[in-house]
A protein has these predicted regions:
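Juxtamembrane regions of bacterial inner-membrane/periplasmic proteins
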Residues: 1-210
């Protein structure tokens, strides 16, 4: 029993240290920057982290507000209130990883997903999660919510080798994004959690049931 109590105490201390590190980073590392330079998105603390911007771009202004609202509700309900990461989600992820000896879970905010898509691998580890939080925080500071949403919709992985709404809508529905029906757009958002789990036919069927 004592052994179990000491293990839980260790886990709680570990989580406390992690959150303190996040807060310290937020307060004392103002040099973190994400900038658009010419046609590239650059993460300044590491100049090697430079991402070309795609040409098949869909402006946020071209997407109906109802569709944007749906995206946020499905992918990240607290998107407009957090600073790029969710402490509660990080907490539950770390608890699961430490107590049950699992790899750290991939659940992330929209901003963290964008950080991972643009600058990081899909490896599930504490170090990658820490970098993800740093970059997400920088994205929030430099780009703002609407720009983050626009970048997210244009870069997120939609399965079958498709990145971004333009490629996804053309692959799954053979349409430009602006010609999609709302139920088709909803189907595309629904598959984002496990994009490679769906075939084109399954996505079309899903759209008919929404």
């Amino acid at each position: 029993m004592k052994q179990k109590d000491s293990f839980y105490t260790f886990c709680l201390k570990f989580l406390l240290i992690f959150f303190v590190m996040v807060l310290i980073y937020e307060q004392f590392f103002p040099e973190k920057k994400i900038l658009i330079q010419q046609d590239r998105l650059v993460y300044l603390p590491d100049q090697k982290k430079s991402v070309p911007l795609e040409l098949e771009w869909v402006l946020l202004s071209e997407i109906p507000e109802e569709w944007i609202f749906y995206t946020v509700q499905v992918e990240d309900k607290r998107f407009y209130s957090h600073k790029g990461y969710s402490i509660s989600d990080i907490h539950s992820s770390l608890i699961s990883s430490v107590l049950f000896f699992r790899k750290i879970r991939g659940a992330s905010t929209i901003t963290q997903q964008l950080a991972r898509t643009l600058f990081l691998s899909r490896e599930k580890s504490f170090s990658r999660k820490w970098k993800e939080i740093q970059i997400a925080s920088a994205l929030e500071d430099e780009l703002g919510k609407n720009t983050i949403l626009e970048y997210y919709i244009n870069s997120v992985y939609w399965g079958r080798g498709m990145n971004g709404l333009n490629q996804a809508s053309r692959y799954y529905f053979k349409k430009k994004p602006t010609n999609l029906k709302f139920n088709q757009f909803k189907a595309l958002i629904q598959i984002l959690k496990k994009p490679d789990a769906y075939t084109r036919e399954e996505v079309i069927l899903l759209s008919k049931n929404l």
